[in-house]
Amino acid sequence: MAATRMISIVGKKDAGKTTLVVALAAELVRRKFRVMTIKHGTHAADWDQRGKDTWRHRHEGKAERVVLEAPGERVVWERRELESDPISLARRYLDGAEMVLVEGFTDHALPKIETYRQACGPDPIWSAERPDAEQWVAMVTDNAKFRAPFPVFRFSDTAWLVTLANIAWDRALILPP
């Protein structure tokens, strides 16, 4: 089995992170790689409905972990005290992934591709002064004047996805077994 690679897609709110994760995932799947994703949420997830069986298992029954098995999909709800890092999450839940695309987790030590739109703020998250600046491997932006010591792609272009997928694959963190 191939080693698992991980790369993080970071950016400010509404900068296009999810759109890029989806596009990269689709391109890598097209290449026949087994792709899985991790999404970092900033607020409590509320996917269950009050009074439904799984909600009752979790809230009334106080179950630590609930697995919902349905036709074509599986959902796991798990109580946790502390936030896990993306590498631990991948090791625990994403066995068999060849590439894990991580949306968010900016402060974790993973190679990063940033989405930066000027409407989201005057500056990207990356700056040369950041102590972790070397973790950035590429940027996609609408700022035609932006320059960096790594590849910079423009949202307005249409031919960069294949190249960016190559960069993601080549520069991703390879998890040791």
Positions of the model-derived regions?
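Phosphate-binding P-loop
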Residues: M1-T4
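Hydrophobic anchor at the beta1->P-loop junction of P-loop NTPases
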Residues: I9
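The conserved Walker
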Residues: K13
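Conserved lysine of the Walker
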Residues: K17
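N-terminal phosphate/diphosphate-binding loop that engages ATP/GTP or pyrophosphate donors
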Residues: A23-E81
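Phosphate-binding/switch loop-helix module in NTP-utilizing enzymes
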Residues: W77-H108
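Phosphate/Mg2+-binding loops and adjacent switch elements
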Residues: M99-I174
